[in-house]
Amino acid sequence: MKPWILGLTGGIGSGKSAVVEQFGRLGVHWVDADHAARWVVEPGKPALARIAEHFGDGVLTPAGELDRAVLRARVFENAGERRWLEQLLHPLIRQEIAEHLSRAQSPYAILVSPLLIEAGQYRQADRVLVVDVPESLQLQRAMRRDQASEAQIRAILKAQASREERLRHADDVLVNDRDRAWLEAEVARLHDFYLTLRGGQP
């Protein structure tokens, strides 16, 4: 039977990585949309050639890899260029994700993405799990992890879907504000529940 897909998301500092890694330890196949976004622009991939052709060789490093910082600066303040890039990459990323998910041997597979809601990736999922956390803890974790200021983290939060919007799409919510042992037990509980589902439905 084809595995059903669980979409997993949460804001910066919510602990998505810790949650999905714990599912992985329980034998669940998972794919990170951020990794897929990197795979489609690796050297030798058609998308990288298209990007270099469109923006010029300045977006490549001397080794022929994509210089993300340069590209980000080019598209950050130019909505038209950002749209062009999204129209090129989003279908390729979706395809890459679908290919990796189709290889799953587990009863369900996980698509983890910080932009699950914003990029419409939740449409690839049968069920959505949101990792939620109080904002004060979110700021504290993200500032510590990224060595960033509160203003920088707040700017990232503004660019992401609001907490309310994420929760509106959620079938399940995991509030990740306790210790590691609690998190492991909560993931195990959700995993047991997910094993009883077919196509993401009870």
Curated annotation (Swiss-Prot):
Keyword Transport attached: no
Enzyme Commission number(s): 2.7.1.24
Domain annotation DPCK: ranges: 5-202
Record carries keyword Cytoplasm: yes
GO molecular function, one term: ATP binding
Coiled-coil boundaries: none
Binding site for ATP: 13-18
Cross-referenced InterPro entries: Depp_CoAkinase, P-loop_NTPase
Cellular component GO terms held in the UniProt record: cytoplasm
PROSITE patterns per record: DPCK
Pfam family membership, one: CoaE
Reaction it catalyzes: 3'-dephospho-CoA + ATP = ADP + CoA + H(+)
Protein localization: Cytoplasm
Gene Ontology biological-process entries: coenzyme A biosynthetic process
Alphabetical UniProt keywords: ATP-binding, Coenzyme A biosynthesis, Cytoplasm, Kinase, Nucleotide-binding, Transferase
Pathway: Cofactor biosynthesis; coenzyme A biosynthesis; CoA from (R)-pantothenate: step 5/5
Family membership noted in the UniProt record: Belongs to the CoaE family.
The protein's role, per its UniProt record: Catalyzes the phosphorylation of the 3'-hydroxyl group of dephosphocoenzyme A to form coenzyme A.
The protein's name: Dephospho-CoA kinase
Gene that this polypeptide is encoded by: coaE
